[in-house]
Amino acid sequence: MSLVGRVGSLISQGVYSVATPFHPFGGAIDVIVVQQQDGSFRSTPWYVRFGKFQGVLKGAEKFVRISVNGTEADFHMYLDNSGEAYFIREVDPAANDTNNLISGSENNNGNQNNGVTYRLEHSLSDSGTGELREGFDPLSRLERTESDCNRRFYDFQDDPPSPTSEYGSARFDNLNVESYGDSQGSDSEVVLVSIDGHILTAPVSVAEQEAENLRLNTPQFHLAPGDGTEFCEGNTEFASSETPWDTEYIDKVEESSDTANIASDKVDAINDERNDLDSHSRDNAEKDSHDAERDLLGSCLEQSELTKTSENVKSEEPGPTFEDRNLKEGEFPLRTIMENDRSEDEVTIESIDTLVDSFESSTTQITIEEVKTTEGSRISVDSNADSECKDEQTSAETAILFNNQESSISVDSNADSECKDEQPRISAETAILINNQEGGIIESEDQDSERVSIDSTREEVDKDNEDRKTVVSVGVTSSVDEGEPDTDQRYELSLCKDELRQGMGLSAAAEVFDAHMISKEEYINSATSILESENLVVRIRETYMPWTKAARIVLGKAVFDLDLDIQPDDVISVEENESPKPKDDETTITPSSSGTRWRLWPIPFRRVKTVEHTGSNSSSEEDLFVDSEPGLQNSPETQSTTESRHESPRRQLVRTNVPTNEQIASLNLKDGQNMITFSFSTRVLGTQQVDAHIYRWRWDTKIVISDVDGTITKSDVLGQFMPFIGKDWTQSGVAKLFSAIKENGYQLLFLSARAIVQAYLTRNFLNNLKQDGKALPTGPVVISPDGLFPALYREVIRRAPHEFKIACLEDIRKLFPTDYNPFYAGFGNRDTDELSYRKLGIPKGKIFIINPKGEVATGHRIDVKKSYTSLHTLVNDMFPPTSLVEQEDYNPWNFWKLPIEEVE
């Protein structure tokens, strides 16, 4: 029993001496940073793994904090579902600059890839070639290699290895950031109005999309049936009809040749707010229906000239004419095709004189003039007898509300100067609203302009404004004033729940959200899988909510027009102890003079371009999010926000394991060894942490490489297990020899094909190794990227550790100048070690192979066998101090030694 007790104590002593904070599925590998001649830095990849079990953690917890020498860095890493840490870097796709990584670090010489994306994949194959390879795909797809053979430098999958390289340069994968604008697509159109799932659009060709403004002279508007049901079910971008739009809209007006649908005896009025308007509209509808029946094939669109001035409006100063606003005389014929039980009702406006206004940029101002009544106009309404407009909300949202169907409308462009101060803002999306609170269009002598604002709520008519006779709003999306908060909301979707965490900051959260934002094409192709994803997050202004929490708000808004409150518990709090700042596009409005509110759609439209056709193309483009929010005056802050949103689709984010030169410089590394800690906190597991070292070397450093298993230890397999039971299984004299080499100015590099999960054990084994009072000198411990079983399979069964070693050493060599070889000598225990060292250009005389008996052979010379102890006596000859200026070829050891005899 005493023997068993002693064995148990030895095992416990050995385990606790090397495995105090042991992570069975994770680890971090030492990093080498080389300072260049110009002061910049190059680094080996930072490979950190916490284990696959971390994949079940919440996205808000997957941020890895970095601490160097006890000081926390000002940047962090991300943690993926496999427990692997990585950096995200933004590159400029316009220049196709991926920073041309060398050994996973930035090429600080300023080299670019000149339009071609390069990546470091398998930096060495079996033959040991480790050149940069041209990427097969541009930075537009996610390239994440999961198999062992495709890992570069480290692989965290427990798969069998392949003959290809496993220690390559940094993984430099592209995060798929789709352009979420429509400006890069095919011919687009301008959304002018939306009525119950229908879209009023004007076509914009591809060539015209590059212009900042487009002017519509006499465009044809087609009101096509939209997919209202699908739109309400979650589409955040408005889908228009599938048919291509006619782009010849400048000088031509399409004549309607469709067969008119002859309606029955009665048509309900569009607006049922006034009974007299009800009956009046019904009588005119019946009359026009019989007129259309006599015409057989429908109505003919008549053109009339715009009334530029009004005889009854007195103004001291003439306002801007239509020529000043780049308008051409004409009218806007509208054809509305609405779907009702698979039958089409056609509403034709045959002669309306003034449904034309300025389609300038989103900052265009326009005065709403007085409305005049003209006799002789006619509006024909053809509708099925069964189609009745019973919904007050629907009638309130109708694009054109007719108040007197026996009238034509003229807009006076000569407005009083006082009206000019009340000009509402107009964007590319134009709604045409004609409303009369008294049941008809009445001539008014009032000089003040009246405005109608489109908002998400409809208010009652103010009693103070009942004396105002007419309200005409042409091209108004919203009125921008201050005083009333914006109540409308815009929803954006992204699959980033696993990467959002509490307190990460608004800018960091926005970066992560935009990196995984769902575009319209992605939603159309895979809407079901997106909605079922657990990582789906909805952004409402600056608020981030999981889809499970935001579904009630989005659906309530889309279906029932409800503005449900956002519960604080439902929100992912990404603010850094500060209240969220309101977005630039959150504006306030005041009630319009008429007191009546109109809204076109309860949820956002898709992105469209400002419409104004000019002779020259503008260098700047501006995209707008079109919705029912109040319009926004283009202040400098607003323009910068809009431009940044327009540029965001062009951003390219890449995944890499190498920090930038600026990030490395911010760490303030000291020469030699630096302690680095990687940690993240979870509510369940607490703080998880792995440690490693960063070694800062100069560009002219000389490196001596040493294998671990079989070279420092006595055998490959037993050397990994004997330290666990407290047994000394090391080669005698190794600590003293390596210490003497280090004292002469050389840096030691410990290279092992062990798995990454053994990084901590290997590092502590070497740090605790002492012989005759002499400790083994410190140096970076670089080990294999593979999992435990693939590493053992390659090391013990296949006997091919050189595959990893050659690739690893090649990448380290690339940290140094191209005309300088930093590797001076190498120690190993196998022929494969010699093969690896020869590939790196180490001469035969500096390659030392040791056998299990402790005998050291140089250059396979069997008759000249030494031990580590005997080599120590020659250390100053074989490893002369680096401070000496004497050339090594002429020192006593190399100059006077006997040449090797030639064997015939």
Swiss-Prot record:
Functional pH dependence: Optimum pH is 6.5.
Tissue: Expressed in roots, leaves, stems, flowers, siliques, embryos and mature seeds.
Catalyzed chemical reaction(s): a 1,2-diacyl-sn-glycero-3-phosphate + H2O = a 1,2-diacyl-sn-glycerol + phosphate
SUPFAM superfamilies, sorted: HAD-like
Transmembrane region(s): none
Keyword Cytoplasm: yes
Chain residue ranges for the region called Disordered: 254-293, 305-326, 440-470, 574-595, 612-655
The protein's Enzyme Commission number: 3.1.3.4
Region ranges (C-LIP): 703-857
Family: Belongs to the lipin family.
Free-text domain note: Contains 1 Asp-Xaa-Asp-Xaa-Thr (DXDXT) motif, a catalytic motif essential for phosphatidate phosphatase activity.
Protein name: Phosphatidate phosphatase PAH1
Organism of this sequence: Arabidopsis thaliana (Mouse-ear cress)
